[in-house]
Amino acid sequence: MVQLPIIDMVKTGQNIIYLRQQRGLSVKDLQDVFGFATPQAIYKWQHGTTMPTIDNLLVLAMIFQVHMDDIVATVD
């Protein structure tokens, strides 16, 4: 039987922080790109509390110039 991947939300959040910093972007910059009234969603992504939607993951991948697989981490 195929072993299905399990998303590691904390590691995914760490990837978002790392990739954001590599691009020289602030949380406010991402907030503006997404048009969020507050930065709370981005902080929740970064802390592994919630995951970005598929649509938002696609935008993050475009902004960071990586594949979505480079953002989402799975449990080994």
Language model features: what each stretch is:
Residues 45-46, 56, 75:
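DNA major-groove recognition helix of helix-turn-helix
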Residues 17, 28, 58:
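Residues within the helices of the helix-turn-helix
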Residues 1-6, 62, 72-76:
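Short, charged recognition helix plus adjacent turn
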Residues 55-70:
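DNA major-groove recognition helix of helix-turn-helix/homeodomain DNA-binding modules
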